[in-house]
Amino acid sequence: MKSGISGFMQKQLSTIIFLGFFLFYLPTIVHAQAPKVTGHDIRFKVKGYKDSTAIIAHYYGDNQYIPKDTAKFDGKGNLQFKGKKELPEGVYLLVLPKNRYVEFLVGEQVQTLEFDTSDAIATMKVSVGQENQIFYSYQKTMSDKAKQAAPIKAKLGKTKNADSTATLKKELEAIDKEVKAFREKLFTDNPKTLAVKLFKAAQEPEVPEAPILSNGRKDSTFQFRYYKSHFLDNIDLGDDRMVRTPIFHGKVEQYLTKLTLQIPDSINKEADYVLKKASKSKEVFKYLVWWITNNYEKSQIMGMDAVFVHMAKNYYLNGKAFWVDSAVVNKIRDRAKILDPILIGKKAPNMFLTDSAGKLFTLDGFKAKSTILYFCDPNCGHCQKETPKLYEFYEKNKKRGIDVYAVCIDRKPDDWKKFIREKKLNWTNVWDSYTATDFKNNYDIYSTPVIYLLDANKKILAKRIGVEQLEDFYDNYFKDKIGGATRE
């Protein structure tokens, strides 16, 4: 038994709204007056339970289960959750034994709900609590009308008679018209309720036909652009309650990760747009700043550290992240300070290193169409395996203008020289003989090996790329950027 917006509503409501085949009717609701209390007092009568324990929990972002209170049945199916503190408003779950649950809304702090576990939606009775009266009446009616419309749809799928088809379509069109009218009335009459905001948030944009361009063809990108530009129209990101719903996180995540091109500039622009919409809600804003920063900091997609730096500069380091203490801000500042100079597209910091004979080789002075900047440690087991693979690639591709600037980060020259001899590394091998280079802070080297790819002007093209990825990268790079340099 699972009921509520994440169960019935997300699976059924979206289908109903998309097809527009189902009529709902919201009966006139008589609102019982809840007594004024301090804190919360939420009561359930559940048929089928006597001596068990139940929990109420709420959604938060992408986490379904944040426990808030526990109670025991009284032997007659009655539960009471009562406390001196008010519960934060949002979508809650009454979690029953055997992982069964029912969803309900906390809008009012005093509520009384009664249902049978065999079908919570059909049997739900709400005697106190406007939010849940709307929430369950809407779902029940939608469910009933879906069943009512199903035979019409089935007939339409089977009939081959043109007149019958036209008649059935008219019936569905009439239902669709009534659906829209009643839905509009519900939204108009109860605009500030969480229930209505949930129903609206579940709606998808209705995309019109693409316009015809001057060349006589349809605008092939119009529908996607329209869908994206209106995707967040119906979700109120300025309402604190939305952060405790099952719709909120998925909606924003889809917008930022599926509808937005996954390159830093695009993500940063859209993140700012979303956060501007959330600026009136401290809770939504707080969650989204945290989630966007955390999501892209952990991303395995190359270059997404630019999103972290953007979030750090524009939200954490300027005081907008009001919930973060100074210790956390300092850590974020330190991390952003390291990453900012070595983002893809920026010029790599110069280095002044020497070879085994003491000859100086600066990175800026290293001439190549593309430089493989390779950080390694002769005592690193992974370097022992990867270096021969890289050298093999280098031998095959050096005539394309690719050269290697191999940096030993270890301070023991004897181990390094032995490593060069044993691996027969006939490329530019350098180390910090002056012990003046901070590899960790200059290039974010906390483990080895690490590869950076640079263009002829030492602009960073890629970083932390595997040897096995070099072939494809350079095939595309030389084709697109240099004009098809070939292997010889």
PLM region spans:
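Non-catalytic, surface beta->alpha helical segment in thiol-disulfide oxidoreductase systems
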Residues: 93, 447-450, 456-487
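Structural microenvironment flanking redox-active thiols in thiol-disulfide oxidoreductases
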Residues: 384-421, 435-441
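A non-transmembrane, solvent-exposed segment enriched in polar/low-complexity residues
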Residues: 32-191, 201-202, 206-238
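Bacterial Sec-dependent N-terminal signal peptides
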Residues: 1-44, 488
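N-proximal helix/coil linker or "cap" segments that precede and/or mark the start of modular domains
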Residues: 298-354, 359, 364-366, 395, ...
